[in-house]
Amino acid sequence: NSIGSLYFTKEAYDKLYPGYGSSYVNFYGGIGLLFEQASSRGHMQETTTLPITFAFTIRNQFAASLATVRASAGEKEMLRKLRKDFFSSAMAQAKASPIKAYVFGDSKDVSRTNAFINLLLLHQIEVYESNQVITSNGKTFEKGKYFIVPTELSNYIMVRSAFE
């Protein structure tokens, strides 16, 4: 290109895993992009194609960031529609799913349950405390010792990913 960068455009990672920062936004109606930059390993590293300097790596990241911002601004209406369609599709999938809620809890390890609840809340997933005893698949859940996450939520894709 105009600044002398080489490109690799093949997808070589699992972008469906929400633990990657570049793919997390995919679970909330965004478009996850991954810009990988070879390391200069300090000030400079010799490679088989060209020497990579720290300044060169910074310039590449900056150029990629500006190009992304420009492209996003130029396509803002399409991106808004994509996000709206994503959440509409998520709600339709949730309504069509036979799973209407996820029930969880560990009465023997309350700390573990609380840690999971905090993780769900961090990701803006609604969690409700039980108010009655239920039995499901031969397991009895006591009042106040289990929690419920409904699936009919706009962030259904993330909810499903967290539980499946």
Regions found by a protein language model. Name each.
Residues 1-6, 11-17, 21-164:
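Intrinsic-disorder/low-complexity accessory segments
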